[in-house]
């Protein structure tokens, strides 16, 4: 098998837009299913964050490796294989870790946001009207499925949406994503609400409330969310609007 094959190795994971294959030698291939003009940017972000991690800042991210020109399809990223389970998988096996994992997610996100965004990193208009010199690195998709739990500690994956901006926006978007994920079953729905509330307390309610409306708008602008998630975000957006008018107390 070669990197140009449709199936370059055993399939390890599948997301909404990409698949991850084991290509041996401690490496994996992340392949987008369609031509993706953000691959170069995502690779640059990951390399930047990996260098920050090696310098003692930020969080552990997979190391990215060069592709040969002949293998570069515009859809692929070759990176270090991370052995472990996602935080979500760990929660499914050990639900009693809910509160400690929510606190860990908040701590990991702070470590991401402690890194100052370089000038070349984009800033979404939903996060801020203009770019600032002291903007933080924002992951903008940091939830339990994008944190790998390993023997060496948490590793953050999937940097597709990474940007620069105010740290509170990243925190609010994580809260909105977790709070509005589409899941079946009353126990799963209750678990999500508990996790979202615990994350909000650990990350800072005031910071999240300040950016909650913008985070909802950012999420609603994402064409990839499911109809159920769109309905959930819309309902949360209405709650935020009511809360801002002062007619009710903050919602967890």
Model-inferred region functions:
Residues 9-42:
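ATP-binding glycine-rich loop module of kinase domains
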Residues 19-22, 120-121, 126-169:
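Active-site acidic catalytic loop and adjacent metal/ATP-binding pocket
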Residues 42, 46-49, 109, 174:
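AlphaC helix (C-helix) of the protein kinase catalytic domain N-lobe
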Residues 50-67:
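Conserved HxN/HPN-centered segment at the entrance to the catalytic loop
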Residues 55, 88-124, 138-140, 145, ...:
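Conserved kinase catalytic-core helix
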Residues 65-107, 128-129:
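Conserved structural core of kinase catalytic domains
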Residues 84, 104, 173-252:
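Helix-rich C-terminal or lid/interface subdomains of diverse kinases
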